[in-house]
Amino acid sequence: MSISHSDTVLIIDFGSQVTQLIARRVRAMGVYCEVVPFQLALEGMQRIKPKAVILSGSPYSVIDEGSPRAPMEIFEMDIPVLGICYGQQIMCVQLGGKVASGHEREFGRAFLEVQENSALFEGVWEKGSCYQVWMSHGDRVTALPEGFRVIGTSKGAPYAAIADEKRRLYAVQFHPEVVHTLDGTKLLQNFVLKISNLKGNWSMASYREQTIAKIRQKVGKSRVICGLSGGVDSSVVAVLLHEAIGDQLTCILVDHGLMRKNEAQEVLTLFRDHYNIKLIHVNAANMFLNALEGEIDPEKKRKTIGRLFIEVFEEETKKIGGAEFLAQGTLYPDVIESISAIGKSVTIKSHHNVGGLPERMNMKLVEPLRELFKDEVRSLGKELGLPEQFIGRHPFPGPGLAIRCPGAVTREKLEILREADAIYLDEIRKAGLYDEIWQAFAILLPVQTVGVMGDGRTYEFVCALRAVTSVDGMSADFYPYDMEFLSKTAARIINEVRGINRVVYDVTSKPPGTIEWE
């Protein structure tokens, strides 16, 4: 479901790991942008009709035979173009300059000396000064195309920043999109808002209006089914669709018995009672827990839950009858990855979602969030008036508590885990830390230890606590709680939850660990 935007930046992706970061920086300025892989760049230009283009970095070498190039048309369209890292090198090569393997490779922190004032540096960096940037290159430009001048140099790159201001072509060897390049975001703002003269008037309010109109146009009088879990994405999808088509929407909450304490009831209260959304609550806990009985392999647990979810959802949809559309909370990173320049990354864990449903059920898709990043989905949720407890909540996996219960899952262990997790999150909120943490949760380990309570000996489970900080979940650091917080939280869990006599804190970063334990 594509939406038209008058001022759009096209980002051509050559496979950089930080291409999405460029897009997020541009979106944060209030300017809409799209990422397209280099193979589809020409089609993207014709479809989007961009007002500016950014060429990303890449793991490729410009020198290698068959390495990707940008369509020559972009340099002939009389629109501003910014090349970053590999993007700088192909701009130079394609316009008549030269690139060679550098004797000194630059990876990580470097320093750029500003040689000339430029519209790209205006109000940010001054001639004669030196600034920290982030480099990641082995090749480097050795000769400039006609019309370009050097505006910045570094120890390993004599042409670290270049410009042809008459044609509004700019290129840098460093990465302005990463936080390690000081004031890099301001350089991008200069390119997008000043050099390209884009207005910065794209907002969640305008996205909401345009998306509602598109939903109505696409769906017409047809009925739509939406799987609702209470997570951020499905909650925003449900409320947005309900605003667009009202009672044509029916939501299904598949309660697999693996949700957090009181979670199912909170979802029912908000969406059925407050929003008056047609919501079917399917209590399938016995089915799921019986199927999981005795299973200790985490991948098999995930696949069992995913398979049963599809079966239950499909059965409920048949009971409703007559629905033509299935709503999904597909986000923009999913879209980018599915058509990425390099291809999808290796699967570390199976992802539990409804990806297999449309084919099985012969339904059309409606994906109102497919142009948004996660932080933008939260902003849209605020625009729609969703409570903070839903839009600000930490990520929760589709398989639920089953993967926070390593080993075999039982009803008893789930109840113990629910209580411990609720106490942990309560203490985090009381300490005012919830919004500082990307994700926090308890894990009930398949290990029992000896303890002493009162005059008696205990032999009960170990509870691990996990909390991480992250920007996008791709990498994460453990949260550095003070010992007083950990001591208080551990004491509450041990005193209030029957079945736990020991609490530990996980101080593993990602990588090498993953955020979830299974």
Curated annotation (Swiss-Prot):
Residues 202-393 form the GMPS ATP-PPase domain. GO terms for cellular component: cytosol. Its EC number is 6.3.5.2. GO terms for molecular function: ATP binding; GMP synthase activity. Gene3D superfamilies: 3.30.300.10, 3.40.50.880, HUPs. The active site is at C85, H175, E177. Residues 8-201 form the Glutamine amidotransferase type-1 domain. It is an enzyme of class 6 (ligase). The keyword Nucleotide-binding applies. Keywords: ATP-binding, Glutamine amidotransferase, GMP biosynthesis, Ligase, Nucleotide-binding, Purine biosynthesis. ATP binds at S229, G230, G231, V232, D233, S234, S235. It comes from the Bacteria. Pathway: Purine metabolism; GMP biosynthesis; GMP from XMP (L-Gln route): step 1/1. The keyword Ligase applies. It catalyses: XMP + L-glutamine + ATP + H2O = GMP + L-glutamate + AMP + diphosphate + 2 H(+). PANTHER family: GMP SYNTHASE [GLUTAMINE-HYDROLYZING], GMP SYNTHASE-RELATED. Homodimer. Catalyzes the synthesis of GMP from XMP. This is GMP synthase [glutamine-hydrolyzing].
